[in-house]
Amino acid sequence: MDLHSILQPISTPSASVVTAPLPATIALPSPNYYYPPVAQGHYPVNNMWSLPSNVRVISSHGAPGHQTSASQPSTVMPALETNASNAQYYPAYSVINGNNSVQVASPAYTVSHSPHSFSNPRYVAVPQKSTSPNQVCSYCEPLPNHLTKTKSCSIPPILNSSDRSPLSLPTPYPVQYSTQPVSLPQPIAAPAPPSAESSKSTISDEDVAWQLIRLGALSSNSVKSSPSKSFVSISSPVQSTVKPTKASGVVKSEKVEKRSLPPQDFGNASSSTSAKRRRPDHNHTSTLDASSSNTSLASTGPMTVSSSTVERKGKEASEVNPNSTSSVTFSDFAAAISRSRCSRCKKSKKGCDRQRPCGRCRDAGLNSEDCISDDDMPVSNARKPRGRGRGRPKTKN
């Protein structure tokens, strides 16, 4: 079956227009453009399509073919093996010649043994109107089959008749061929914060201990900002209360010591020590000064400042450490001041209190009473060692 037998029943006596051989320009397709689906003037062909002999076809697959003997410049035709019995007819397309048009039915031949056969349908796009007398026929790449589930493609149609480069649309639009609904990923909900009840049930003993430590630190800070009286009552381990008693017309003060345990503080131990350091000393000092002055007036009359200071220091030491073996009294301190100091304690700034022997007597097993180091004067004529930092060798050559 040839083309003339197809065109003969369609041509009627009323349609006296004879279709002349029209050159057709087929542009090369581009894989990056989208060809729209079947619309007006488009029809699908299964594997290959047939056109008149004056229409040139350029295959985009570079298949070996044979040359045509047409009057136009030769182009490559794909090698086809057609069978007339397998021809399938499709709706006609319009061949435009000036202002007149002739309906032409085009069969679709099935490629049986060609190595360049295609399974997807092709689309032939013929414009409805043409400003030039020449016919324009666009040959497109195979589109994805509608029966298969293909995602999308973005290839615009080729509409340029003079240039072989495809015309790119400014906004290529994608087309979804998928028939199943697309399920978007749902956002993962953030875990809810633990409630108060659950957090109470999961608190461990270590958390309770840390909380008590924090509370202890807060209480120590509040103690620092409290008045001095409550301050001393909390931090100082020794509380002294003065009870005046009348004896021989002179008011004497007797100190009643009360031992009190320090409060249990889970915070750092430096809080109580820092509280002691920042405690105003005038209250405690004035009490001690008043008691010492009263005692001195009752017993021996006025004393020097140094002796009162020594007495005060001794009493403070006895109050702090009452279990000490040596009981310090005023007479001992007075004797210590008049007694000559040992050679070891002469060099010290605090002076010798004779409370402990020097290192030589201690090694010999002597106590502070039997210490004889005060008579052991250093020899002034002894040879002093020379330093070795000035280039002096230890041995002579």
UniProtKB/Swiss-Prot annotation:
Basic residues biased stretches: 383-397
Entry-linked PROSITE patterns: ZN2_CY6_FUNGAL_2
Transmembrane intervals: none
Keyword rRNA-binding: no
DNA-binding region coordinates: 342-371
The keyword Endoplasmic reticulum is assigned to this record: no
Molecular function GO labels: DNA-binding transcription factor activity, RNA polymerase II-specific; RNA polymerase II cis-regulatory region sequence-specific DNA binding; zinc ion binding
Cellular-component GO terms for this entry: nucleus
Keyword tags: DNA-binding, Metal-binding, Nucleus, Transcription, Transcription regulation, Zinc
One of the protein's GO biological processes: regulation of transcription by RNA polymerase II
Region (Disordered): 159-203, 221-397
Compartments, record wording: Nucleus
InterPro entries in the cross-refs: Zn2-C6_fun-type_DNA-bd_sf, Zn2Cys6_DnaBD
Biased composition annotated in UniProt, kind: Low complexity: 221-240
Biased composition (Polar residues): 285-309, 320-330
Top-level taxon of origin: Eukaryota
Residue ranges, compositional bias (Basic and acidic residues): 350-363
Protein name: Uncharacterized transcriptional regulatory protein C56F2.05c
Species the sequence originates in: Schizosaccharomyces pombe (strain 972 / ATCC 24843)
